[in-house]
Amino acid sequence: MALRPSKGDGSAGRWDRGAGKADFNAKRKKKVAEIHQALNSDPIDLAALRRMAISEGGLLTDEIRCQVWPKLLNVNTSEPPPVSRKDLRDMSKDYQQVLLDVRRSLRRFPPGMPDEQREGLQEELIDIILLVLDRNPQLHYYQGYHDIVVTFLLVVGERLATSLVEKLSTHHLRDFMDPTMDNTKHILNYLMPIIDQVSPELHDFMQSAEVGTIFALSWLITWFGHVLMDFRHVVRLYDFFLACHPLMPIYFAAVIVLYREQEVLDCDCDMASVHHLLSQIPQDLPYETLISRAGDLFVQFPPSELAREAAAQQEAERTAASTFKDFELASTQQRPDMVLRQRFRGLLRPEARTKDVLTKPRTNRFVKLAVMGLTVALGAAALAVVKSALEWAPKFQLQLFP
């Protein structure tokens, strides 16, 4: 069964609506105090900061984010930031593409911002991107990367954004910055197994429509920055993602699809109709509810379980991309995700999977937050599941952008 849509204006839950002003202010004040207490602890209480970032309302203000985001990414703010070289624009092979993307990013800046200020920020955005790429030649620019960088720039400023983006690019975003889209494609392949765990009916409908997962590509590689119009919702998601496992964005993508289950099932069962519907992401989503449910699914169906299942399926059958001819056809028809089309249909589904997974007793909140944040606390080990999964997965030549 789906995550049923509920009425709401899409704001950040009870922090913005539904409670009296006095109650709201009291909760906010209490949370701010808890965040500062965690920051002032010796050593800093990172587990508490992760809980604050994940829990309802997130980190609340950009001022707090300037203090907490570096801690979540283990960036030492006392160290001098990287210094941009004046000749980078002349030397960088990516400069022209970065320039085009940044020029198209007008809507990512606050409405009403003076042109002069916006243009100055766009220049800073270009400098940050080129500097990170120059310092890390193993990284490759992709269209959509600027949508993530501009979020950090607007929240923490150029100096701190450079350090944060560099750390993020070598960790959470690392798979997106390979020479090809192979690893990105593999991460997208987690989407359908997650959906299948909650709603086999929706999963089978989408498989019959052969819609694939391309509709979620821009969600994943921009952390939803490219598709959400309200900057408050973007930074709220960044609070969540920075405090969690690198695969959490794909879980959030799954709960969006599940939330819209009835809309999808009411569509014509063909690729064009379903792709069009899912590509148009609603702006009034109940973000706090979806964040909580994404966390529930992560705990109930961790990446290691889904990765092994997907890997076994990939070994069991050939895919549309396994030969050049089939790959060419799949790319032309925008149906590249055939890896999980038949997921061991001979195996019996447990009875419980026909029920709504999310009707089970809710996971203890503190246990759930601890599990979601655990891999982040382990630093480089946070990517171990992803890396091991990629070792099992076959490689696909799939170039999605010009």
UniProtKB/Swiss-Prot annotation:
One family name in Pfam for this protein: RabGAP-TBC
Record SUPFAM superfamilies: Ypt/Rab-GAP domain of gyp1p
MF-aspect GO terms: GTPase activator activity; small GTPase binding
Keyword field: Disease variant, GTPase activation, Membrane, Transmembrane, Transmembrane helix
Highest rank taxon of the organism: Eukaryota
Gene Ontology terms: cellular component: endoplasmic reticulum membrane; Golgi membrane; nuclear membrane
Site feature Glutamine finger, where: 143
Membrane topology: Multi-pass membrane protein
Domain-related comment: The arginine and glutamine fingers are critical for the GTPase-activating mechanism, they pull out Rab's 'switch 2' glutamine and insert in Rab's active site.
UniProt name for this protein: TBC1 domain family member 20
Annotated source species: Mus musculus (Mouse)
